[in-house]
Amino acid sequence: AYAAGSGLLDVMLMFLLVPALERLFNLTTDFRLAELTSTNNPLIKRLFNEAPGTFNHSLTVANYVEACAMAIGEDTFLARAAAYFHDIGKLKNPNYYVENQTDGHNPHDEIAPELSVSLLKKHIMYGVMLAREYGLPKELESAITEHHGSFPMKFFYYKARKITEGELDLKNYSYDGPTPTSKINGMLMIVDASE
């Protein structure tokens, strides 16, 4: 009876102490990642309700990135969580992103390509702000900042070339980086660009 009671007490203490220790020492455990990727997570719920196209895109990316992570022996929990949250910045002005344009109206048709690039790049900054507001781990924050690397937005570059005389610098139509610093973020960048 003593052994059973002691074991039960140990399990209860573990469930109470692990979250506190995770936050105290800034650790990201599989328990924390599982909690974050739950459909009960408030940020996941917001994505589902406010930007459903982005939510579906994130789920698809998560499935591919998780499979890639498993294939090369990387942390599948972290890979899935990174994919779930990489585009949370799209919660600000979700209609600027094609996956959320359900009524056929694209606001980018009415504005200059340079403004479109500026607006689209801001989802990175907004994503970092939300990650900090919701207390997401640093690993997920880096996935947000790195998932586009310095890829160009060629659609807007070519659109600008059609209406602009002279040379244009492709860097002005590209994401600001940084490039991925982990295998998971690199896989996320590739899968996100191809999905």
State where each predicted segment sits.
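Non-catalytic interface/linker regions that flank or bridge core catalytic/transmembrane domains
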Residues: 1-45
